[in-house]
Amino acid sequence: MERWSYISLLFVALLFGSTQQLRSAEGAFRLRLNCKAAIECGAISKGDTIAIKGFTWGELSTAPLSYGIVKGRSIILTLQNAKCGEYVVELRKRAGGSKGASAEDGSNGASAEDGSNGASAAGGRVRNVMEFFVSDAESHREEKYAISYKNDAFYAQALEGAAENGLLAELNASIRDFSAGTIGNKQAKEALDSIYSKALASDSSALFTSLCRLSLDNRCRSVRYIRSVLPLEDPRVLYTNFVKSSVESYLKSLERNSTEALTFIAEDLVQSAHSTLKPYIALQIFNLFKEAEIMGQEAVAVEIAKRYLLNDESGSIEEMLGYEAYFGIMAFVQMNEHSLIGMKAPQIELPDSLGCLHSIPECGEGADDASPSLQLFYFYTSNCSSCRATTPLLAELLQRYEGIPIRIYAIFTGSNRSEWMSECAKFSLIKNPLVERIDLWDPEVESNFPLLYGVISTPQMLLTTDKGIIVGRRLTPKSLEQLLEAINEN
């Protein structure tokens, strides 16, 4: 097993627990940390802040859910109505020896064993002390740990509490020893196999074992296998870190599939998830594909957003995302849904320098025999550094172009006519008989081209067939050249 495969199990193990439905645990969940060993070696000092933070779909909370100032050898941290999920305990070293500042409003209280109130320290280095999992097993409402420090890492030994967290502490210790080089590959594998066997023997570790199987079994790496062990039907994974990265890895492993196949797979992923997870998975898919490296895959983001993020009459998704993020998704869809690959390019009318209107793209029906087989839309302006770099590269490419006829619509997006005329002169290099150039503009934006063609920035390039079908978008001179070569080879 690769070194980083072991380390990845750290995140896997954080999903310990039963497979019951997610709910807030009744009463308080207490975490008792005996820090004697860590204090004696100076890793933890009086005045340092100990804080519990939780995850929501891979994002660590910024404010502590519970906190305390180190004053004695033991610290008790309390989570009120804790959600079932993954938590981390962070240590923030006091800055400049200060005793700390007042607590943040709304935080749950925590105390040192002498009963003094906790406070958050200002500044200082933050270190991850340990991880634990809150299950909804009512028999385990308190976890006890001994915290030590060696090899520049904190170690947590579980003294009392849920069996899952005992295995988690054991796993973390093995991973940290392996990372520090104190144990080798063979010892690490033996330790992890032992922990996995213990997890299999536990009645309440189905979620953990399904994820452990994914990381431990090197013989099964098929896409179908990866998909089968993603526990998306379990609502508790909303409050974890590992599953989000697993979903992303799964989707990235499929990125060479067609856009249609990816859209189907993405929809299946969302549909298979628990209702509380659906918007989070949909948002993750949207963010992954909205700036897709492979041309055309932004269509996946558009489709998922329309079906699962914007089609919400209750307003709960807008509340979850916040107005700005929700509006950003809406704007992305509106600026891209009309000009995706495979679609017929929207028809617009733009004037040339003489005021003659040109209806573009030319769609072939009723056109004369000289109509171009390819049509290139190039949106650019004068006060754009990227345009100043792209225009000469594009002109040089079209000058040496050899292939089926192509027409370029050089569409100036500014409103200054003299600047437009200066920009037109930059295309004078093109004297290729296979290339026809038409200079157009729309200073009043009467054609609504920014919305119809997704021109939120310049330069933008889009290629269509003689029928006006979009075959390339978001092109650069290099990707345009590659696309033209592929088209001409066929």
Residue ranges, per PLM feature:
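Bacterial Sec-dependent N-terminal signal peptides
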Residues: 1-33
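A non-transmembrane, solvent-exposed segment enriched in polar/low-complexity residues
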Residues: 25-100, 105, 114, 118-229
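N-proximal helix/coil linker or "cap" segments that precede and/or mark the start of modular domains
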Residues: 297-353, 362-372, 399, 418, ...
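Thiol/disulfide oxidoreductase modules built on the thioredoxin-like
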Residues: 445-483
